[in-house]
Amino acid sequence: SSAAGRATNVELSAAKINGVVLNPGEVFDYNAVVGKRTAEAGFKVAGAYAGGKVVQEVGGGICQTSSTLYCAALFANLEITQRDCHMFAVGYVPWGMDPTVSWGGPEFRFKNNRDYPIKIVAKTENRELTIEIWGTDVDGSYVEMTNSVSTVYSSKYPSVAVGTKAITYRNVYDKDGKLLSRTKEDVSV
């Protein structure tokens, strides 16, 4: 089934990123680490977005892993160097916090902009995916993500809703809760 294939693909992609260590300045490249999604590599057929619709393809569902990793990278206050959103909303992360990935297509990359190594820890248990980024806490700062979601209307027919727009902000606070910075992370339409 598509659900079983998706679960296998999420487990397999999580296993491939688990344990990756990035030294200062190194860039994590999701497609390079996970590799080409093929049946020979163990990936299964499951639902994926392509060409404006849901299709069945080998590796479908791995964007849940890339999206969970993206959220972990944001909360670790790492530098996102490449990310494209899905053409439709996804149900596993908040609006505007989903990077779509595809072999030979959209990419997701982030840079370890810290002065120390970081490690990706990914696991699946009972069909739940958890991803953490381990590193050294040097100042006690923390990140909160916020987003502003609005309806997009047709320019030709102003009363017709044609989509949704999400603007995502990264808010960095010091250990005492004082806002240090608020950065527009991305706009998803």
Regions found by a protein language model. Give the residues of each.
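Well-ordered beta-sheet/strand-loop patches within structured domains
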Residues: S1-V189
